[in-house]
Amino acid sequence: MLILGVGYFLLGLILLYYGSDWFVLGSERIARHFNVSNFVIGATVMAIGTSLPEILTSAYASYMHAPGISIGNAIGSCICNIGLVLGLSAIISPIIVDKNLQKNILVYLLFVIFAAVIGIDGFSWIDGVVLLILFIIYLRWTVKNGSAEIEENNDKNNPSVVFSLVLLIIGLIGVLVGAELFVDGAKKIALALDISDKVIGFTLVAFGTSLPELMVSLAAAKRNLGGMVLGNVIGSNIADIGGALAVGSLFMHLPAENVQMAVLVIMSLLLYLFAKYSKIGRWQGILFLALYIIAIASLRMG
């Protein structure tokens, strides 16, 4: 099992690395072709694509009458996206935040606060429908109000949109399959080393559903595509709440997770306050990363 686990682990890592790079490259070229900003692509196409694991996991968990896993996966992934994904991305490449991005972050913050308020007593199917509708409205608003910052000489030399779309799809498949193999391989290694199921579930499964966002955002950060990173994080969080959590609540009532929601609100508020200064730099990234580690340690101790 150990050898098989190492093989899955390494193959998953390779697919994650190249898949995320192709996904970002295809997304960037499509953004230029359709004259939309990197943020819009990040908040829509990339966010929905990388949030598929969370949406499917939460929906299936609710269907199988495991509400704690359903809501924990959705909210935990949101915390991971800000603390780990955005934190590491900002450390690699500081993110410049213009007025338009600040407005998007404010909308995101209000969405999170609204979700926290209606979820004080848990999430019913009515709450799920409301969040799902707000998610759809957000997507339309983002696309409609997104303004691109395109250089004039980019259009002529770009490959065709079909090639870019194929690159995007292959990259997304690589990321999703790679994440599954990576986590499965890590589980096999852990079991072979007699690590408990509880530790495996708490660490690897929770981290695994956020791997697509992490790898895609790091690939974008290496290309200095800060808007795409921010769009992916914000869009993924809205998709996790308005998609994963909302769909999960349609199958059964989800319990309140006020501590996790409070952590998410605080981290989202810090994100907005940092963005007001027009830059999320390395020190902010280190702070987000530290807060994520503290939050995970506190939740585990609780």
Swiss-Prot record:
It is a multi-pass membrane protein. Keywords: Cell membrane, Membrane, Transmembrane, Transmembrane helix. One of its GO terms (molecular function) is calcium channel activity. The chain crosses the membrane at residues 3-23, 39-59, 77-97, 106-126, 128-148, 163-183, 199-219, 227-247, 254-274. Its main location: membrane. GO terms for cellular component: plasma membrane. GO terms for biological process: calcium ion transmembrane transport; intracellular calcium ion homeostasis. It is found in: Cell membrane. PANTHER family: INNER MEMBRANE PROTEIN YRBG, SODIUM/POTASSIUM/CALCIUM EXCHANGER. Belongs to the Ca(2+):cation antiporter (CaCA) (TC 2.A.19) family. This is Uncharacterized membrane protein MJ0091.
